[in-house]
Structures are given as C-alpha cells and as structure tokens.
Amino acid sequence: MGPRFQPDDTLYKRRNTLKVEYVPDDIVGRDNEIEEYEAALQPIINGEYPDNIFIYGKTGVGKTAVTNFLLNELRESADHFEVDLTVISLNCDGLSTSYQAAISLVNNLRGHENHIAETGHPQSKVYRLLWNELNKLSGSVIIVLDEIDHITDDTFLYQITRADNNGYIDNIQLGVIGISNDSTFREQLDAKVQSSLCETEISFPPYGTEELQKVLEQRAEIAFHESALEDGVIPLCAALGRQDGGDARRAITLLRKAGDLARTENANSVTTDHVERAQEKLEAQQSMDIMRDLTEHEQLTLYALTTLAAEGETPARSRIVYQRYKELCEFQGREPRTARRMRSFLSDFEILNLTLSEMEHRGQDGGTYRQHELNRDIATVVDALQTIIGEFGAHQSIIEYLPDSGEEFATM
C-alpha cells in the first residue's frame, strides 16, 4: 500500500495565493484609494517629512493589503533612490492600553534578547526607552499601527504623533499610519490627537460586486489551472461576498473552500454547487465563533432559549425566556441581569442572525408581545455552548444533543 497522502494538482496551481496573508503583485479594485495613499507617501522619496495617515473601513475592504503593497513598493523605491527608510509594523489587537502599546513598540525596536518585561515599569521610563530606540534610527521612519482602534486611550497616540514637536526625537523624520476597522474611531480621539494623526484620511468603502469579481478573477488566475472553475463560480462568490458586506477576504476564503471541497470529492472542476455548500459551512462556522465569543450572560440567555426550543416551546415570549434564564442563573448562584438587559441580548442575537423574532398581536384585550426562536439548529447551538453547559449543568431537554448523551456533564 502506498502513502496515504498523495500530491494532487488537478485543480490548484498555487493554493496559497487564496490565503489572507498573500499580497498580490498588483492590487485591483482600489485605484482611487491607491492614488490617494501614494500621494501621501510620496514626500518620503522626496526627502520630505511624511504625513501621518489615518486609514479606515470595514474588515476585508483592502486596507491592510493596500498598505502592505504600497509599503513594499515604497521600500523598493527607497532602495533605488538611496533614501534611508525604516518601516515598523505593530498590530494593536490585544493592546488595549497605551502602556501596552508603548512597550510592544519598544520591544519591536529592540532585539529579542533585549526585550523588556510587559509590566512593572513607570510610564515615563517606557517612553524614555521608546525615544532612545527611535533616535538610534535615521532618515524616514514609518510606524504602521494596524487595528489601532483596539487602543482605548489617547496617551500613546498623542505621544507618538507629537514626538517631534515635543522634542523627543531629533534624528529621524517620523510618520504614523493608523489603520482602523471602526469608522467612528477618529471622532473618539482627543482633538489634538485627531489633528496630528489624521493629516491625511483615506476611507476604504466596501467592495461592490464588480470589484469583488475583479479581485477573485486575479486570484483565480494565479491559484487554479485553466478550466478548473466552471462558469458562474466567480460571479456567485462575488455576489455572496457583496451580501457579506463587500468583504474581499470572505469572498476569497469562499472560493478557496469551494476549491477544497471540489478537491476532496475528486471533482474535475469547481462548480456553483461547491460554492453554495462551502458558503453553508462558512456560515455555520461563523455562527459557532460568534456564539463562543458571547459573554457569560449572553450565552446563558441563548442557552435558555435553546432549552425551550428542545422542549418544543418556541417561539417563546420574552418573559418565558427570562424565567428560564433566571433558573439557569440561580442554579449556580449567579445574579441574573434585569429582564430589560436580557431582552437587549435577544435583540442582539437577531442582528447576529442567531435567532428570529416577531411581534404577536392578540386583539384589543390580548396586547402585543414579542416571541423568539432559534435561527440555528439545536445541535449546533449546544455544541457552541458546551463550556457554559459544562459550568452550569446540562438541562434535561438538551441531553440528547450532547456528546455521549451528556455523560461528562452534570445535569440540572
């Protein structure tokens, strides 16, 4: 018997080009944004002081891809024209405070063996170390702060964008590029930070269907063999990506998942049926991720509705859901949130497409009330809520949906 895993290049030429991390040789569908961005970076090649640039738009609209593409081009131009340029990139995901951001930037600038501890330093010392590290550099320095909206206070942004004005740096021309998924982040900043960080603002709108189709056609040409995709595959991926908010990452991932599904089935080509089934799987996984990321009391509210669904008692009125939610809380001695707060959780679930609700009218005397039901099958929700079920106990109604009939779970 031969090896279990065999090379397979029937469909793909370069599957990796359908990964989020891949930066293409050319960016399509973002001509206007690239033109604005390029103009803002041009002063660096001229030997002039760079502008600070604020980039904003939803996830998957090309902000990071365009930034990486243009910075690669900028480095090549700097090498060609012998311009002294250093680019420092910092992803701010997980850096909720200015203190954390400043330490991360210090450690980014220092060699790994010279990293400082993440806690225990006076703030003044951290910034002194930061200025010392920056002053070891020369020429133009660009600091890229991706997901900048994760930093919840302004101190770091104020310090870094006004370092030259405040006399902290004297050997470099410093520019900052801030990238945010939150279009309202700018309005939340202190006025001084706004004026410093947002010298140039570039908005990235969601991709339209035609733009997504161009993006997908570019990737497909590199990733797949000729004739590997049937007619209609790319238009369908683009249309579904547009429905998901014009998210190019999502559309590219969908195309890759459809290709993987076709390869698993030993198909000779990728069809629209593969796309539709891949979309169903992605939506299911997205729902799982959303449910697992809910807060404890949000999960308990969803758990309460799920037990009612398992009993065949949905659609259920808000007060019925609240009664079951209180029972779950009281079983573990937790203080329940108010009924009003729990109703806000239910409203959020509907926005997230986890549940459905409708207003019920019972005539003049019966009043009006809202009823709720799951928009996902019970087994999927139970699977996503296993941690909270393990902590609070398995309600009798959902035992059959648990692994091994709930043997490892305490019952209520």
From Swiss-Prot:
The keyword ATP-binding applies. GO terms for molecular function: ATP binding; ATP hydrolysis activity. It comes from the Archaea. Transmembrane segments: none annotated. Gene3D superfamilies: 1.10.8.60, P-loop containing nucleotide triphosphate hydrolases (3.40.50.300), Winged helix-like DNA-binding domain superfamily/Winged helix DNA-binding domain (1.10.10.10). HAMAP family: ORC1_type_DNA_replic_protein. Belongs to the CDC6/cdc18 family. This is ORC1-type DNA replication protein 2. The lineage of its organism: Archaea, Methanobacteriati, Methanobacteriota, Stenosarchaea group, Halobacteria.
